[in-house]
Each structure stands twice: as C-alpha cells, then as structure tokens.
C-alpha cells in the first residue's frame, strides 16, 4: 500500500482536529495594508464571490484573519498575472473544498499549508491553471505529479512560502 502524505496528514488529522492554531489563523485581528485594495475593491470582490463578507452587520472592512490576508495577497498576485475574477473564484472554490468539514476555517487547505510552512519550512507551491483551478502542495508532490502526468497543462507557479512572509 502506498503512503499518501496528504491523505494521512490533512484528511486524516488536520481536518478533524480542533487546533488552537486554526482559531488563531481565523481570528479577525489584522488590518489590510495593501494600498491597491480599497473598500470599494473589497466590495466588488465580494459581489463577484471572490471574497466572503463576514463583517458584523455588513459594515467596515477593517479587520481580517491571517488566512484572509493570505487569500487577498493571492488574489492580488493572480490579478497581476491577468486572471479574471471569475477564474479566481474557481480557485477559491478549490481552496474552500473542505470548509464544510471544518467549522474553524473558511480555507482549511490554506490553514493546513500555513501550519506546514511555519512548522517545517519546506517549500509549498500553488499551481494555477488557465481555467482558474488550482493545486496547492509540497514541491515534492507537485513535481512528482508533473513527472507522472505526461499531458500536464501549463500553469502559473506561485511560491506559497514567499506569499505568506
């Protein structure tokens, strides 16, 4: 039987644990310091479904969780590459895939890899495909998958470690 690192560590452990780390990552305590992202831009992103509005009474875009800030940085980066908001929304859905199973997190996959990067300092990458779908994973798994799949599509490569600094 082949060992599946992701299945054991994410699906088998992280997703089902109530970790204090998840609570900290998802606690709204940080201000957004990206001058290009105004409240108007945030409202537009909310209207297109790229971000979820979790504001109390729908007022004030002043506080975000660490995970939300990482997601906003990723949106900015993907927009710099010319990806449309509709395609970014597809990527959001990929990252939110396991949110129904995790009461603590909107983006369990991001939280998992944030914990992994902080704990082990190994390289984690994002691959964003032309249709907006994305993969996130350790460099070793993504490299192995690319070598296995001879018909691999082109993608945008984003260094997750650099994104979260």
Which role does the model predict for each range below?
Residues 84-88:
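Acidic, low-complexity cytosolic segments
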Residues 91-165:
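Exposed, interaction-prone assembly regions rather than primary DNA-binding/catalytic cores
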Residues 1-71, 76-83:
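Basic helix-turn-helix/winged-helix DNA-binding cores
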């Amino acid at each position: 039987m082949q060992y599946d690192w992701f299945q054991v560590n994410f699906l088998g452990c992280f997703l089902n644990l109530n970790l204090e780390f998840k609570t900290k990552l998802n606690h709204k305590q940080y201000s957004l310091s990206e001058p290009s992202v105004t409240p108007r831009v945030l409202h537009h992103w909310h209207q297109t479904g790229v971000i979820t509005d979790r504001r109390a009474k729908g007022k004030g875009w002043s506080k975000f969780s660490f995970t939300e800030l990482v997601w906003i940085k990723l949106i900015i980066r993907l927009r710099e590459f010319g990806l449309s908001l509709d395609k970014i929304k597809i990527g959001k859905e990929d990252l939110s895939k396991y949110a129904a199973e995790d009461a603590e997190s909107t983006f369990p996959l991001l939280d998992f890899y944030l914990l992994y990067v902080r704990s082990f300092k190994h390289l984690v990458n994002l691959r964003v495909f032309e249709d907006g779908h994305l993969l996130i994973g350790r460099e070793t798994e993504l490299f192995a998958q690319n070598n296995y799949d001879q018909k691999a599509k082109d993608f945008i490569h984003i260094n997750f470690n650099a994104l979260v600094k």
